[in-house]
């Protein structure tokens, strides 16, 4: 089954908690704190794989979760880092993260970080100072990043075969490559793109057979529209035309239909290198139709083939190689720039709003501090309050009208405001 669009949820691993421990050994007085740090949570990456041609395996997984980091331990031992999760996806996959275009994997083995694992919490050995020699403080591991991810596959093929239904595209692909697409004598036999690798005179290239396009495809009519995006990146287009016509129209009328659909869908597609192939020449019912087609077409080269018998295939392959050797200027039409370059934008340490009588403080710094603080440890709680005070949260709450006894919320933690 060919799947070219998938939505999934990614959750990086949480960091391991830091440890509170003190060195206790005979003959070692004042051993001091030796609680180790927690390990970082695992990251999640996408990596392009040339052997994958569909997103089918991802469609069965609505959620991916990386491994959490392990807790720190005594002896100043850090916890093990969570294992990174690497998800293989086909070449040419567009990645949309939280509704915005994030990356486009165009090269084999390209790997990109999507969500980062949480930082491991610090153990009490990390809080030792000259003045504070016996800290009873440790942090919880920070949660990993999460993201809603949409994947959209755009096949990367050197040659794209297109045309009206039943023009013989699948048969032609099976002649020039080892691909074995479904072939039958009725329209819309091909319901999804087929990829094949062509090996001709020591040269290799890929070819894709696109499902039949019908009139009005640019408006979303028929099957072909769903797959037109797959030929945006092809270097050469092979326009396959049934010599006997289709749907009661002669070959030239059918040729014009496909050309018009390409122009309406994308001006860039209409400007690509195109090889015109008049197929099923062995079953031509009228030589007059062939002459009429050539008369109206007015192109320097027209290839007459029979994909069923192999007639004209060798000449067509030579032309494909010749066209592929020409330089191609790829258009950026329909493409957008990735957003995975991090932008640094100044944000205040916190903002305060009032919701249903509760003072709500938001901001990356105060929320992260809240997430990693162990509130069941008295010393950790005192440290938490001192940091918030130094940040100016208490003064700002008073300015907003907070009084003793009012509720303050930061993240999932609520506490009572005191003077």
Swiss-Prot record:
Q: Which UniProt keywords apply?
A: Cytoplasm, GTP-binding, Hydrolase, Magnesium, Metal-binding, Nucleotide-binding
Name any one GO molecular function: magnesium ion binding
Q: Which cofactor does it need?
A: Mg(2+)
Q: What class of enzyme is it?
A: hydrolase
OBG-type G domain mapped to chain residues: 157-325
Signal peptide residues are: none
Q: Where, by residue number, does Mg(2+) bind? A: 170, 190
Question: Could you say which EC number(s) this protein's record lists?
Answer: 3.6.5.-
What the entry lists under Pfam families is as follows: DUF1967 (PF09269), GTP1_OBG (PF01018), MMR_HSR1 (PF01926)
- The UniProt record gives the binding positions of GTP as 163-170, 188-192, 209-212, 279-282, 306-308
SUPFAM superfamilies hit by this protein: Obg GTP-binding protein C-terminal domain, Obg GTP-binding protein N-terminal domain, P-loop containing nucleoside triphosphate hydrolases
Q: Which GO terms describe its cellular component?
A: cytoplasm
All residue ranges annotated as the Obg domain in the record: 1-156
**Location relative to the cell:** Cytoplasm
Keyword Protein transport listed? The answer is: no
Question: Locate the OCT domain: which residues?
Answer: 342-419
What top-level branch of life does the organism fall under? Bacteria
Q: What does this protein do?
A: An essential GTPase which binds GTP, GDP and possibly (p)ppGpp with moderate affinity, with high nucleotide exchange rates and a fairly low GTP hydrolysis rate. Plays a role in control of the cell cycle, stress response, ribosome biogenesis and in those bacteria that undergo differentiation, in morphogenesis control.
Could you describe the subunit structure of this protein? Answer: Monomer.
Family membership: Belongs to the TRAFAC class OBG-HflX-like GTPase superfamily. OBG GTPase family.
Q: What is this protein called?
A: GTPase Obg
Organism whose genome encodes this protein: Endomicrobium trichonymphae
């Amino acid at each position: 089954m060919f799947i070219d669009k998938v939505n999934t949820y990614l959750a990086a691993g949480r960091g391991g908690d830091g440890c509170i421990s003190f060195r206790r050994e005979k003959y070692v007085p004042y051993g001091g704190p030796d609680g180790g740090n927690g390990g970082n949570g695992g990251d999640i990456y996408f990596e392009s794989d040339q052997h994958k041609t569909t997103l089918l395996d991802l469609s069965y997984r609505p959620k991916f979760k990386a491994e959490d980091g392990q807790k720190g331990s005594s002896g100043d031992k850090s916890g093990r880092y969570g294992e990174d999760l690497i998800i293989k996806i086909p070449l040419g996959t567009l990645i949309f993260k939280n509704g915005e275009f994030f990356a486009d994997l165009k090269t084999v083995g390209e790997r990109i970080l999507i969500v980062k694992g949480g930082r491991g919490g610090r153990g009490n050995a990390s809080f030792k100072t000259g003045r504070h020699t016996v800290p009873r403080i440790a942090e919880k591991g920070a949660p990993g990043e999460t993201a809603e991810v949409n994947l959209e596959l755009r096949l990367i093929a050197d040659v794209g075969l297109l045309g009206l239904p039943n023009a013989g595209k699948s048969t032609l692909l099976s002649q020039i490559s080892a691909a074995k697409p479904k072939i039958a004598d009725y329209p819309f036999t091909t319901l999804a793109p087929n990829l094949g690798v062509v090996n001709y005179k020591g040269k290799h290239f890929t070819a894709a057979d696109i499902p039949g396009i019908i009139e009005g495809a640019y408006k979303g009519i028929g099957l072909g529209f769903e797959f037109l995006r797959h030929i945006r990146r092809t270097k050469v287009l092979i326009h396959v035309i049934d010599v006997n016509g289709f749907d009661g129209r002669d070959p030239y009328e059918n040729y014009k239909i496909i050309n018009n659909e390409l122009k309406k869908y994308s001006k860039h597609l209409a400007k690509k290198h195109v090889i015109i192939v008049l197929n099923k020449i062995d079953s031509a019912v009228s030589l007059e139709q062939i002459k009429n087609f050539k008369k109206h077409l007015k192109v320097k080269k027209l290839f007459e083939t029979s994909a069923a018998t192999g007639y004209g295939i060798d000449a067509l392959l030579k032309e494909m190689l010749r066209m592929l050797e020409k330089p191609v200027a790829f258009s950026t039409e329909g493409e957008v720039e990735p957003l995975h370059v991090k932008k640094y934008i100044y944000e205040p340490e916190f903002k305060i709003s009032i919701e249903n009588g509760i003072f709500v403080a938001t901001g990356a710094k105060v929320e992260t501090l809240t997430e990693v603080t162990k509130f069941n440890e008295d010393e950790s709680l005192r440290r938490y309050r001192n940091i918030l005070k130094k940040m100016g949260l208490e003064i700002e709450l008073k300015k907003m009208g907070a009084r003793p006894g009012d509720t303050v919320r930061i993240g999932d933690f609520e506490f009572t405001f005191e003077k």
